[in-house]
């Protein structure tokens, strides 16, 4: 549930305001003044809550909704109780997220963990670092020589920013995160415990065992990227590791040296991307995906969760399985194996 102790709504919105803000169509203009000050799942709802229904899986909830208003596609609009204001939108969840950011702005973007409004007296900042006015540096932060931090950026307690790193404006670095050898754009969110710019896993076989290869590249993180808690992004060996604009990376993701990820990609938790992989724009990776080194994943590809990739994926294709292959082929193989297993079992039972 949404606890107002943690997340108080910014203000009340009317159904008419929500329609205008999201580009939705309010079915009954007589419900323009319906008040909305909470968000809830359709299965729970609430007296002043906005909910959304976006597929046949949860459309069965429509007749029994308990909510102030619902965002839904046109085909479900006539199934809602008359007491619920219906807002028609082709992408209800997207509209719902927009309203959520307006109702609960502090939940949409991380902020200071303390009441600090400037630079804490308990932070260590090298005299050669440049912190723009309006940045917030909380207690326990360590900022090295030559660092630049833009206005509006929050550096949470005990984060460490290494020598000469640049962090743009209106960003966030979470508690205990560490950043080194990195150039970071504007509005970048790096959650607590993340590690950016450490050595890539570079070793070469030697007479006495593995020998370290110096990693002398950087990490470049473009604008509007988000990196989840305890994820790691290794710096390049000689070229850069690059995370493209708008890409969102979940918790516990490993990105190795020299990887290049395009724009607006989604990488779900527990995924691992090996060295020198190139990922195009608008790629989606499910949880636990593993990519072998030096692969190319084409723009718009979708990679199924828990899949292992040892070959390139063409643009726009859906792949999955282990080893991964086009999803239709993977499903056919699974169906064939099941058929063969059943036939074998029946043969044993009859014989």
From Swiss-Prot:
Gene3D superfamilies linked to this entry: Hexapeptide repeat proteins (2.160.10.10), MurE/MurF, N-terminal domain (3.40.1390.10)
Gene Ontology biological process: lipid A biosynthetic process
Keyword Lipid metabolism: yes
Reaction(s) catalysed by this chain's protein: a UDP-3-O-[(3R)-3-hydroxyacyl]-alpha-D-glucosamine + a (3R)-hydroxyacyl-[ACP] = a UDP-2-N,3-O-bis[(3R)-3-hydroxyacyl]-alpha-D-glucosamine + holo-[ACP] + H(+)
Keywords noted in UniProt: Acyltransferase, Lipid A biosynthesis, Lipid biosynthesis, Lipid metabolism, Repeat, Transferase
Keyword check for RNA-binding: no
CDD domains from the UniProt entry: LbH_LpxD
Single Gene Ontology MF annotation: N-acyltransferase activity
Enzyme Commission number(s) of this protein: 2.3.1.191
A matching Pfam family: Hexapep
One Gene Ontology CC term in the entry: membrane
Active site per UniProt: 257
Pathway the protein contributes to: Bacterial outer membrane biogenesis; LPS lipid A biosynthesis
Family that this chain belongs to: Belongs to the transferase hexapeptide repeat family. LpxD subfamily.
Subunit structure and binding partners: Homotrimer.
HAMAP family, per the entry: LpxD (MF_00523)
Function: Catalyzes the N-acylation of UDP-3-O-acylglucosamine using 3-hydroxyacyl-ACP as the acyl donor. Is involved in the biosynthesis of lipid A, a phosphorylated glycolipid that anchors the lipopolysaccharide to the outer membrane of the cell.
UniProt cross-references to NCBIfam families, sorted A to Z: lipid_A_lpxD, PRK00892.1
Protein name (database record): UDP-3-O-acylglucosamine N-acyltransferase
Species, as recorded: Mesorhizobium japonicum (strain LMG 29417 / CECT 9101 / MAFF 303099)
High-level lineage: Bacteria, Pseudomonadati, Pseudomonadota, Alphaproteobacteria, Hyphomicrobiales
